[in-house]
A protein has these predicted regions:
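Structural recognition of an alpha-helix C-terminal capping motif at a helix-to-coil junction
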Residues: 44-51, 65-77
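Acidic, proline/glycine-rich intrinsically disordered inter-domain spacer in sigma factors
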Residues: 2, 98-127, 195-196
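Helix-turn-helix DNA-binding module
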Residues: 124-135, 143-160, 174
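Amphipathic, Lys/Arg- and hydrophobic-enriched alpha-helical face
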Residues: 22-40, 55-56, 126, 178
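Arg/Lys-rich amphipathic alpha helix in sigma70-family domain 2
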Residues: 55-62, 73-97, 107, 115, ...
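Short, charged helix-capping/linker segments at alpha-helix termini
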Residues: 12-20, 30-48, 62
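C-terminal edge and immediately downstream basic/flexible tail or linker adjoining helix-turn-helix-like DNA-binding
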Residues: 91, 95-98, 152-153, 170-198
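Residues within the DNA-recognition helix of helix-turn-helix
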Residues: 25, 164-167, 171
Length: 198
């Protein structure tokens, strides 16, 4: 199996091979965008992410493990444009307790919380975070990026990522009265993506 970086490099002379990268990562980019801005915006963000990546592939020179964070960084930049859609989705989630929205990222905590009452509180608490804190915690929790990957995606030092995630966790804990996303790692800095259930 080719690494992501090998695919990017080969696509410079054989553009059709870039489709392998799309096949490998498009579902994750779509899910991340849908969780942040809803299904309607997710299609556009996913498509535009891969268009921007394809057009910028000649300039990519990072390590193999940086391709996924590079793609999520592009998606995150595009989502900034869709911030209003994300804000509307989180406000709607807060208003209606999550009914009528996919909000897949909240499903992981359903075992800990009452879906009708706390899902709306979670949406409101996420919306209340500063955008840079919300971006960091959602890249961590919903895009499953490491702290290094988030630093690559957002273009900030890893220490800044740690601070933003720590602040977001503290604010969420204070607003909600329980820990959200705290049990995802125990060493205050995921070094590898969390294992996916098949």
């Amino acid at each position: 199996m080719n690494t992501d970086k090998e695919i990017v490099e080969r696509s410079r002379s054989a553009p059709a091979t870039f489709g392998e990268l799309y096949d490998r990562h498009a579902p994750d980019i779509y899910r991340y965008a849908a969780r942040r801005a809803g299904d309607f915006a997710a299609e556009d963000v996913m498509a535009e992410t891969f268009l921007v990546a394809f057009e910028g592939r000649a300039g990519f020179d990072g390590p193999a493990e940086a391709v996924r964070p590079w793609l999520f960084g592009i998606a995150t930049n595009l989502l900034r444009r869709h911030h209003r859609a994300e804000a509307r989705m989180l406000r709607a989630l807060a208003r209606n307790g999550g009914r009528g929205h996919s909000a897949d990222g909240l499903d992981a905590v359903d075992a800990k919380v009452d879906a009708d009452g706390d899902r709306s509180r979670i949406g409101a608490a996420l919306h209340a975070l500063a955008p840079i804190e919300r971006e960091a915690i959602l890249l961590y929790a919903w895009a499953d990026l490491t702290y290094d990957g988030i630093a690559t995606a957002t273009g900030v030092p890893i220490g800044t990522v740690r601070s933003r995630i720590n602040r977001a966790r503290r604010k969420l804990r204070a607003d909600l009265g329980f820990a959200l996303f705290d049990d995802m790692d125990s060493d205050h800095g995921r070094t590898a993506p969390a294992p996916h259930n098949a």
